[in-house]
């Protein structure tokens, strides 16, 4: 299965890395890091996102967001599932408007036109009315809106457990098995 992971310029890029770590050996994985993601990661972690990815993820195909001629820009390439996590509000608005000015935005447009699974881990708080309208319209088109929200039943006691829960929920939506959090049980 071919999966595309986009990590866009929202805060909490670490959530995208957690997802990347758990996807890498489960599928044929393509990843696009936006310029905003790289800048935010450097600010939040005092580290270079591209270097960390190149050192730690050997089986992932990292793609240049500026190169719209790459394979994932075409529906014939066969990406089955696309997830943008975290997804910035700017990316959300561009996807809703059909503004495909980067490889990631073009890949999202392809997912929409090909009626493939598209998941957006929208990372913002609070949402404006305009943000909610974008999410509503995209949801009506079949896009899954999956903000990074923890649940009390996850019993998360620290940041890593919270990140595991969120990444696990995204993996559930991608239909990828994992053991990142304990599933709900009727006690």
Swiss-Prot record:
InterPro entries: Flavin_trans-like, Flavoprotein, UbiX-like. The keyword Flavoprotein applies. Its EC number is 2.5.1.129. Dimethylallyl phosphate binds at residues 153, 169. FMN binds at residues 9-11, 34, 88-91, 123. One of its GO terms (molecular function) is flavin prenyltransferase activity. Flavin prenyltransferase that catalyzes the synthesis of the prenylated FMN cofactor (prenyl-FMN) for 4-hydroxy-3-polyprenylbenzoic acid decarboxylase UbiD. The prenyltransferase is metal-independent and links a dimethylallyl moiety from dimethylallyl monophosphate (DMAP) to the flavin N5 and C6 atoms of FMN. Belongs to the UbiX/PAD1 family. This is Flavin prenyltransferase UbiX. It comes from Campylobacter jejuni subsp. jejuni serotype O:2 (strain ATCC 700819 / NCTC 11168).
């Amino acid at each position: 299965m071919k999966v595309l992971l986009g990590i866009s310029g929202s805060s909490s890029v670490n959530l995208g890395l957690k997802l990347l770590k758990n996807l890498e050996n489960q599928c044929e994985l393509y990843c696009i890091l936006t310029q905003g993601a790289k800048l935010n990661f450097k600010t939040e972690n005092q580290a270079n996102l591209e270097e960390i990815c190149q050192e730690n993820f050997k089986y992932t195909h990292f793609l240049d967001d500026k190169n719209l001629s790459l394979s994932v820009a075409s529906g014939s390439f066969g990406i089955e599932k696309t997830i943008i996590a975290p997804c910035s509000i700017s990316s959300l608005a561009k996807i809703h408007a059909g503004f495909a000015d980067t490889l990631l935005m073009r890949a999202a447009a392809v997912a929409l036109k090909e009626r493939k699974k598209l998941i957006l881990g929208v990372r913002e708080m609070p949402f404006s009315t305009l943000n909610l309208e974008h999410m509503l319209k995209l949801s009506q088109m079949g896009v899954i809106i999956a903000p990074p929200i923890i649940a009390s039943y996850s019993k998360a006691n620290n940041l890593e457990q919270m990140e595991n829960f969120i990444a696990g929920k995204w993996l559930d939506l991608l239909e990828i098995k994992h053991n990142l959090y304990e599933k709900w049980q009727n006690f």
